[in-house]
Amino acid sequence: MTLLSCITALTLSAVMIYSPLKLLSDVLLKQAEIEEDILLNQNMNRAMELLMRAIREAGYRSNQNSKNENDIQIKQGGLFRGSDAIELMQDLPKHLAYDCMGNILSKERTRHRKTYQHFYLERSRNDPRSAILICQSLDRQGRLHQAELLNQVQYLQIHWVNPHAVDINSMKPKVASGLIKISLGVERKSQAGKGNTLIEQVRLVAPRHI
């Protein structure tokens, strides 16, 4: 067998072996990305549910003399990539209820007889191109403490919307009544070097007591 024949045979063998290996590698990478997408969506769902629960209960009054005009405060922009923040307060409920960290709301966890929860973004220390969704609440001494709810966040947008609008994209900010629109974006980093993927969720929630 000539040298040229040997080189040709080796080349053909390499091509035949490389193609299945490349295909298998691509399949495994795609499977890993799908699994990460599922996990990110689950984590986003959990964070959204905690935020929506706090919004639904905000403004609760234990008696008619209690005021709740300022129990929902949305802060527009000024945070990571212009993201919004929301502060939520309510009188201590008579039924069993929890804050965003899973603590039972109690008299000790109030300030001026109101519970407090705050959702906002904080730039990640490990990856300055992304942020962490933070939840603040009150501990048993009525002091602020916080927990991280979600990583790899790109934006959080919150505003009052027109409850009569049909198309979500056409909804306009309004005064404190009706519905609140929450938009959350999380980035999944590509393992194949083909660019990152933005995963987005939008929810509408109606406060029950405002």
Enumerate the language-model features and the residues they cover.
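N-terminal single-pass transmembrane signal-anchor helix
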Residues: M1-V27, E36
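Exposed loop/turn and edge beta-strand positions of beta-sandwich/beta-sheet ligand-binding modules
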Residues: C6, G82, A176
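Short, flexible loop/turn elements at secondary-structure junctions
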Residues: I7-A9, L92, Q157-N162
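Extracytoplasmic beta-strand-rich oligomerization domains located immediately C-terminal to a leader/signal peptide
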Residues: P20-Q141
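Short linear sequence signals and composition-biased patches located at protein termini or domain-edge surfaces
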Residues: L39, G77-L79, R143-I210
